């Protein structure tokens, strides 16, 4: 990816249970197991708020291949930020943190960000606004297709729940731009 073309941020979750300590190296292994060259995200925010570097910004991302407002796949012009979590967790009989399942046996999406993760995410996004001409901050789910053509990505249109919170309302462009002054 050409860093001069970066104009968007896409926020993700790792889709791992709340409280389970997962690091960028773990996500890298998961992504390589899928046949990818390396971790798809540029940044990973750990449970304690540590921001880890993932895929270099000089490489195309591997986090959101949907085309954005520019008509170009986000992987070509966006920064991918992933927070660890996003699935409701529970502790099993062995004391391991595992996904909590609903009545149909599906994982339960949930905003599991710790206070430290929220603080780190806000700082990182505002820092990126100072470094790049960002015009869009979205959650991965916001890149789902607008099936009914009403200009809004409604919940029933989401391909996935990731990142399990409303990124657009938490990071409105006007507020982020105002932070530059």
Where are these regions (language model features)?
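Short beta-strand scaffold segments in enzyme catalytic cores
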Residues: 41-45
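Basic/polar, cationic surfaces and motifs that engage anionic cell-wall
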Residues: 1-10, 14, 18, 48-51, ...
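Short Gly/aromatic-enriched secondary-structure transition segments
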Residues: 24-31
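Short Gly/Pro-enriched turn/cap motifs at secondary-structure boundaries
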Residues: 33-34, 69-72
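N-terminal cationic-hydrophobic initiation segments that often serve targeting/anchoring roles
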Residues: 32-35, 129-130
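Flexible, surface-exposed loop/gating regions in the mature catalytic domains
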Residues: 59-68
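Short secondary-structure junction motifs
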Residues: 38-40, 134
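Glycine-rich catalytic cores of cysteine/serine-nucleophile enzymes that process amide/ester linkages
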Residues: 25, 38, 51-54, 62
């Amino acid at each position: 990816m050409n860093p001069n073309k970066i104009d968007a941020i896409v926020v993700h979750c790792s889709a791992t249970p709340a409280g389970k300590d997962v690091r960028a190296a773990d996500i890298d292994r998961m992504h390589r197991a899928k046949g990818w060259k390396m971790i798809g995200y540029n940044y990973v925010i750990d449970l304690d708020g540590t921001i880890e570097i993932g895929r270099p910004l000089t490489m195309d991302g591997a986090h959101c291949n949907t085309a954005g407002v520019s008509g170009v796949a986000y992987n070509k012009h966006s920064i991918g930020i992933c927070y660890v979590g996003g699935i409701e967790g529970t502790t099993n009989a062995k004391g391991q943190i595992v996904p909590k399942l609903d009545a149909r046996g599906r994982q339960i999406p949930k905003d599991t960000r710790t206070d430290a993760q929220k603080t780190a995410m806000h700082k990182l996004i505002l820092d990126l606004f100072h470094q790049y001409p960002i015009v869009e901050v979205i959650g991965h789910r916001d890149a789902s297709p607008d099936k009914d053509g009403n200009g809004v990505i409604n919940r029933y249109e989401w391909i996935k729940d990731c990142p399990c919170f409303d990124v657009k309302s938490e990071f409105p462009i006007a507020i982020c731009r105002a932070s530059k002054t």
